[in-house]
Amino acid sequence: MARSTARRRALNTLYEADEKGQDFLSLLDERIAQPGAQTPLPEYAIEIVRGVDEHRRDIDSQLNTHSTGWKVKRMHAIDRNILRIATWEILYNDDVPDKVAIDEALNLSKTLSDDAAPSFIHGVLSAIVAAKDKQSPQSTPLDDSDKDESDQTN
């Protein structure tokens, strides 16, 4: 099953739990045990929900830091959970390129949210990626001035 479908199924689970005030993992366990009319949850959807739950405090902190004028609790539930999924993918899932995480979040927001959501989501996620890139130093080769003098021969 495509990862896009898995993201959407994870979003459905996170959104439903959020709206009900239910714990993410307890609803996930219900969905795994009794998928109802839908096909069983894809493994990647389960991984997303568990990952978002495990890192929720840090994810929400990142969202609060990088969203101007909007705290997580004030965001629309659908936008909040789209952002949580993409932030988890950006910060905790090295298998997904940052650009893909952002593009997938934008696709979900264009279909499921209001007209202002895609630009808001893009801005927040771009800021998170920029902060992540700033924190992870790029390795650069040493030039001659960085070498220890004992390594140089006369």
Curated annotation (Swiss-Prot):
Which Pfam families would you find in this protein's record?
Answer: NusB
Q: Which domain of life is it from?
A: Bacteria
Q: Cite the InterPro entries for this sequence.
A: NusB-like_sf, NusB_fam, NusB_RsmB_TIM44
Which SUPFAM superfamilies does the record match to this protein?
A: NusB-like (SSF48013)
Residue ranges for the region (Disordered) are: 132-154
| Keywords, comma-separated and alphabetical | RNA-binding, Transcription, Transcription antitermination, Transcription regulation
Gene Ontology biological process terms, A to Z: DNA-templated transcription termination; transcription antitermination
- Would the keyword Transcription be found if you checked this record's keyword annotation? yes
Which molecular function GO terms apply here?
RNA binding
Q: What does this protein do?
A: Involved in transcription antitermination. Required for transcription of ribosomal RNA (rRNA) genes. Binds specifically to the boxA antiterminator sequence of the ribosomal RNA (rrn) operons.
Which family does the record assign? Answer: Belongs to the NusB family.
- NCBIfam families annotated for this entry? nusB
Stated name of the protein: Transcription antitermination protein NusB
Specify the species.
Bifidobacterium animalis subsp. lactis (strain AD011)
